[in-house]
């Protein structure tokens, strides 16, 4: 007896027999791919099967982005699937943001790195560096500076009063002008004006230490802010060094200001 041949029907006929309408959409994940199967009617009013294949890939994102993707949707998109919906969301071009390092911001706001506030000023070439680091140190430019210092010292020695009379040692200090009850000698003291607010005692010492030895220095500061008031007094051990300081520093540019240096006027006790 010949075998009964079974006639295989198409999948569309089987679906039509099993379901009265369109079957539900199914999703399956295999080998790193996602398969979405949907059923719909075409323009000829026939059932069609549409299979979409998606490749699953892992992406490392910031924690804030991952947390934002878990937010619950609301409104018209309340029942939407994860991800953007083309009917309610328009995806624009990707914008890449570059975040600056906080250390770069601190460096930009550091007042010590501001070139307009550079306190270093060379006495030899007027450059923005200390005199000890001057590339012209020991050259003809440095020699001219030393000649000015020697000329100022010589003029101070000529102006000093000369007398052939014997003066006892205990009376020598009393004959110096400006010597008060406290033993302060104002004849070798100078007043430096037009200093910047950022001036410090170390800067003042660096400014005058190569001219000659000093006995005392005083930088006037504001009691409330602690900033320099704009002037200072320097007492040299020898009057010729004080005269040399006036000759060299008066009119000298320092910290973007022009210094004014003169003899300190004796105070009336």
From Swiss-Prot:
Q: Tell me, what is one Gene Ontology molecular-function annotation carried by this entry?
A: RNA binding
Which PROSITE patterns has this protein been placed in?
RRM
SMART domains, per the entry: RRM
Q: Name one GO cellular component term.
A: eukaryotic translation initiation factor 3 complex
> Coiled-coil region(s) at which residues?
none
Reply yes or no: does the keyword Cytoplasm apply: yes
Subcellular location, in the record's words? Cytoplasm
Per the record, a Pfam family? RRM_1
Annotated ranges, domain RRM: 188-266
Any GO BP annotation: formation of cytoplasmic translation initiation complex
Keywords attached to this entry? Cytoplasm, Initiation factor, Protein biosynthesis, RNA-binding
Highest taxon, organism lineage: Eukaryota
Predominant place of localization:
cytoplasm
- Keyword Cytoplasm included in the entry's annotation: yes
Homology family? Belongs to the eIF-3 subunit G family.
Name the job this protein performs: RNA-binding component of the eukaryotic translation initiation factor 3 (eIF-3) complex, which is involved in protein synthesis of a specialized repertoire of mRNAs and, together with other initiation factors, stimulates binding of mRNA and methionyl-tRNAi to the 40S ribosome. The eIF-3 complex specifically targets and initiates translation of a subset of mRNAs involved in cell proliferation. This subunit can bind 18S rRNA.
Q: How does it assemble?
A: Component of the eukaryotic translation initiation factor 3 (eIF-3) complex. The eIF-3 complex interacts with pix.
Q: What is this protein called?
A: Eukaryotic translation initiation factor 3 subunit G-1
Q: What is the native source organism of this protein?
A: Drosophila virilis
């Amino acid at each position: 007896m010949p075998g009964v041949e079974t006639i295989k029907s198409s999948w569309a006929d089987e679906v039509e027999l099993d379901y009265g309408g369109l079957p539900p959409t199914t999703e399956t994940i295999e080998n790193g791919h996602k398969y979405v199967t949907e059923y719909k009617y075409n323009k000829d009013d026939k059932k069609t099967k549409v299979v979409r294949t998606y490749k699953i890939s892992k992406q490392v994102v910031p924690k804030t982005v991952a947390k934002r993707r878990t937010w619950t949707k609301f409104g018209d998109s309340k029942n939407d699937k994860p991800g953007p919906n083309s009917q309610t969301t328009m995806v624009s071009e990707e914008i890449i943001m570059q975040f600056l390092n906080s250390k770069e911001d601190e460096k930009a706001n550091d007042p010590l790195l501001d070139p307009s506030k550079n306190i270093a000023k060379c006495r030899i070439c007027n450059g923005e560096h200390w005199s000890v680091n001057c590339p012209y140190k020991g050259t003809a430019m440095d020699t001219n500076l030393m000649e000015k210092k020697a000329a100022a010292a010589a003029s101070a020695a000529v102006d000093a009063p000369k007398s052939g009379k014997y003066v006892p040692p205990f009376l020598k200090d009393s004959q110096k002008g400006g010597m008060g009850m406290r033993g302060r000698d104002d004849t070798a003291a100078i007043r430096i004006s037009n200093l910047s607010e950022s001036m410090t005692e170390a800067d003042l010492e660096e400014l005058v230490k190569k001219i000659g030895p000093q006995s005392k220095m005083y930088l006037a500061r504001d009691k409330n802010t602690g900033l320099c008031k704009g002037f200072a007094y320097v007492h040299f051990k020898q009057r010729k060094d004080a005269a040399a300081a006036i000759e060299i520093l008066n009119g000298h540019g320092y910290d973007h200001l022009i210094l004014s240096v003169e003899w300190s006027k004796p105070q009336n006790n």
